[in-house]
């Protein structure tokens, strides 16, 4: 897969890192789905986006059209399966607990298309400790923001 083939991004985890990563992806033109098991976190993440984008317009960092398109590019769901089903690239930003990350990656392996790259945003857990939870260890990597 070539970088130009990446159109759809799934961000797992709607906390501080996750929702900001998802927002950045949406601003840069990717169809982005942010997912979390917590409806409360998803609501907070969506509220952040709805406040952040107009704020960037006010500061002259984005045009109104860019902000509008970014908002159209991002959606939120509590369903990991729904979030991952069309992903070309997945960025996991869940809690720094190895067992949880391994479970998330095992589920992503089932739900994401075979071509999808699965990245962890972890700064403490290397991808080699997660990769074997999938059937695609060669497509698992660390990507830290």
What residue spans do the PLM features occupy?
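NAD(P)+-binding Rossmann beta1-loop-alpha1 motif at the extreme N-terminus of oxidoreductases
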Residues: 1-55, 59
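Phosphate-coordination loops involved in phosphoryl transfer and adenosine-cofactor binding
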Residues: 3-8, 86-87, 115
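Structural motif
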Residues: 12, 20, 77, 93, ...
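Generic structural signal for residues in well-ordered beta-strands
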Residues: 32, 74-76, 140
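Short alpha-helical
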Residues: 40, 82, 99, 125-126
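A structured beta-alpha segment of the ubiquitous adenosine-cofactor-binding alpha/beta core
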Residues: 56-111
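Rossmann-fold NAD(P)-binding glycine/threonine-rich loop
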Residues: 102-145
């Amino acid at each position: 897969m070539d970088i130009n083939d990446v159109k759809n991004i799934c961000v797992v985890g709607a906390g501080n890192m996750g929702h900001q990563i998802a927002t950045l992806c949406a601003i840069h033109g990717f169809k982005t789905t942010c997912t979390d098991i917590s409806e409360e976190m998803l609501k907070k993440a969506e509220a952040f986006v709805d406040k952040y984008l107009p704020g960037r317009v006010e500061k002259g960092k984005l045009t109104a059209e860019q902000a509008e398109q970014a908002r159209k590019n991002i959606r939120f769901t509590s369903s990991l399966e729904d979030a991952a089903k069309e992903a070309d690239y997945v960025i996991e930003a869940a809690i720094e607990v190895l067992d949880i990350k391994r479970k998330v990656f095992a589920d992503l392996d089932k739900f994401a298309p075979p071509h999808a790259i699965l990245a962890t945003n972890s700064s403490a857990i290397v991808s080699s400790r997660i990769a074997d939870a999938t059937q695609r260890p060669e497509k698992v990597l660390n990507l830290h923001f």
